[in-house]
Structures are given as structure tokens and as C-alpha cells.
């Protein structure tokens, strides 16, 4: 009997851990939900294989907010690859085309901006008018949603333009995704043949150059680690980030974190996302 018991213990020791068996990150997420009095959705996915490493509420809907801009520029690059668009094409616009928070596009009313410059502004500075101008080139919210369906994402949906899409009403399915769907879509854009290798590199570089994500995962990133990301925010209790991370300056994993329905301040939301990121990184380094 003792021999059988030892054999069973030895066998169990060789079995792989379950997908959700990352205790430290999940404990941090539960703590964050308690401190935020809201919901957290998260997924950590291996970039090469697509395997889920850690997940929490990964199939629940969360507002995309400005994280949609990565998918938007992916759709733009798909049109470039198909010969239907050029990054060098200049787009001219008027004062009435500008919406709240347009730090780059508001400076180019006289000369306009190229499609590539608009993508850079939308991702690196989260410029809302740049996003709307690009959204018009892909057929608006319905056109971007159609692109998502074409690449196999049957969950993510965009219904409105900037800045209304950031409304984040409780229970509202408009302009939402799930952590699992967003991670899978990001992986398709960056690793599959949905985009050319050149377009994949360009999309990733725009995320590397993100200049408005400092208080989140970048604030806890160890020296020598790679990060490329895009954040999103709402005045109504939501916050989010999509990121690629890895040691040795190499992208190895996709991390998607969304918050919703929290009364916490923006600084507190940032701190909680940074804490979740730190827990993931610490667990990774073990």
C-alpha cells in the first residue's frame, strides 16, 4: 500500500499545472478586485504557441476604450498589404473633425497627416481624432467589427467613435471585448499571415513607442525586459492595457488586463494594474 501511495505521489508530481495555477498573480488580482470594488479581467498568453498561462474573467466583457486603436491600426495595415491603402497617403481634416484629447492631430490642421503618422499618433499618444480619421478609412465602427470577424474574432465589437466609445456603462456590450478575444486577436495580427512581416514589425514598433503608458506595467518592468503596449481609460470606472512582455528584450507573452465598474481614482487604477503586472513578472522569474 505504501508503495502504491508513493507511486501515485510521484505520478502527480509529473502532471502539468492547470491553466489557472498561478497562485501569486491570481491572489493579486483578487486583492485588486477587493481594493477596487470592481471587476478585473486578465489573460497571460504565450506568444509563440497561443497557450493560456494565467487567466481571470478572461471570457467576460470589458470596455476596450483606447486599446481598440491597436486593432484599428492592424486593420489599416491589412489594407496597406492588400494594396488598398498607403501609409504615405496624406489626409487633410478640419477643426470640426477634432475631438477631445488630440495632442498630435490638433497641431497639423494646416498640413494634414499621413496615414502612418495618424497610426503613430493614435497608438503612441492615444490621439482620439487620429483614431477617428483612421476609423473612417476602414468603414467606421461597423467596418472594424467586420475586419475582426474576418480574422476570426467573433466577440470583439466596436459600435461608436471617439470619444463616445469610452462611456463604459455597466452591463453595456457596446465597444467591448474579452481579455481572451483581445489576446487572440493581437496574436493573430503579430504572428499569423493576417499581416505581412513588414506590417507586423510596424504595428509592434508603434506599441514599443507608446508614450502614455508609463504609470502601468512599464513602471514595474525589470531592466532589460521588452514591452510594447497600448492603454485605455474611461472616466466611468474602467482602465485597460494590452501588452507584449519578455526578458532579454524579447516579446514572449501577451498580457491583457481590463478593469471596470470601479469607483477608484485613475491613479489607483494605474497602481492596481502595475501591481498585477509586477505579480506576473515575479511569478515568471521563478
Curated annotation (Swiss-Prot):
UniProtKB keywords: Antibiotic resistance, Disulfide bond, Hydrolase, Plasmid, Signal
Secretion signal, residue range per the UniProt entry: 1-21
A Pfam family of this chain: Beta-lactamase2
Catalysed conversion reaction: a beta-lactam + H2O = a substituted beta-amino acid
Domain of life according to the entry: Bacteria
Disulfide bonds: 73-119
UniProt EC number: 3.5.2.6
Catalytic residues (UniProt): 66 (acyl-ester intermediate), 164 (proton acceptor)
Gene3D superfamilies: DD-peptidase/beta-lactamase superfamily
Note, other: The class A beta-lactamase family has a specific amino-acid numbering system, sometimes called Ambler or ABL numbering and often misspelt as Amber. A multiple sequence alignment was used to derive a consensus sequence and then the consensus was numbered taking into account insertions and deletions. This allows use of identical numbers, e.g. for active site residues, despite differences in protein length. UniProt always uses natural numbering of residues, hence there appear to be differences in numbering between this entry and some papers.
Function summary: SHV enzymes hydrolyze broad spectrum cephalosporins notably cefotaxime and ceftazidime. SHV-5 causes particularly high levels of resistance to aztreonam and ceftazidime.
Record-stated family: Belongs to the class-A beta-lactamase family.
Protein name: Beta-lactamase SHV-5
Organism: Klebsiella pneumoniae
Amino acid at each position: 500500500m505504501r508503495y502504491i501511495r508513493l507511486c501515485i505521489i510521484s505520478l502527480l508530481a509529473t502532471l502539468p499545472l492547470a491553466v489557472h495555477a498561478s497562485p501569486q498573480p491570481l491572489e493579486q488580482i483578487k486583492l485588486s478586485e477587493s481594493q477596487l470594488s470592481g471587476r478585473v479581467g486578465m489573460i497571460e498568453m504565450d506568444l509563440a504557441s497561443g497557450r493560456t498561462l494565467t487567466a481571470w474573467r478572461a471570457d467576460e466583457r470589458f470596455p476596450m476604450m483606447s486599446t481598440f486603436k491597436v486593432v484599428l491600426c492592424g486593420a489599416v495595415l491589412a489594407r496597406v498589404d492588400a494594396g488598398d491603402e498607403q501609409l504615405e497617403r496624406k489626409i487633410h481634416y478640419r477643426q470640426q473633425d477634432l475631438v477631445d484629447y488630440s495632442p498630435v492631430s490638433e497641431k497639423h490642421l494646416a498640413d494634414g497627416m499621413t496615414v502612418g503618422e495618424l497610426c503613430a499618433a493614435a497608438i503612441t499618444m492615444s490621439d482620439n481624432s487620429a483614431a477617428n480619421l483612421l476609423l473612417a478609412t476602414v468603414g467606421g465602427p461597423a467596418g472594424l467589427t467586420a475586419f475582426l470577424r474576418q480574422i476570426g474574432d467573433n466577440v470583439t465589437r466596436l459600435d461608436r467613435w471617439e470619444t463616445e466609445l469610452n462611456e463604459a456603462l455597466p452591463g453595456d456590450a457596446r465597444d467591448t471585448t474579452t481579455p481572451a478575444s483581445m489576446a487572440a486577436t493581437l496574436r493573430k495580427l503579430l504572428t499569423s499571415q493576417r499581416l505581412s512581416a513588414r506590417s507586423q514589425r510596424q504595428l509592434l514598433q508603434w506599441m514599443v513607442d507608446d508614450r502614455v503608458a508609463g504609470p502601468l506595467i512599464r513602471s514595474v518592468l525589470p531592466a532589460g525586459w521588452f514591452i510594447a503596449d497600448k492603454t485605455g481609460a474611461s472616466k466611468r470606472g474602467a482602465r485597460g492595457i494590452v501588452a507584449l512582455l519578455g526578458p532579454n528584450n524579447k516579446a514572449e507573452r501577451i498580457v491583457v488586463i481590463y478593469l471596470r465598474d470601479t469607483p477608484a481614482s485613475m491613479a489607483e487604477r494605474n497602481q492596481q494594474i502595475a501591481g498585477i503586472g509586477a505579480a506576473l513578472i515575479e511569478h515568471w522569474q521563478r
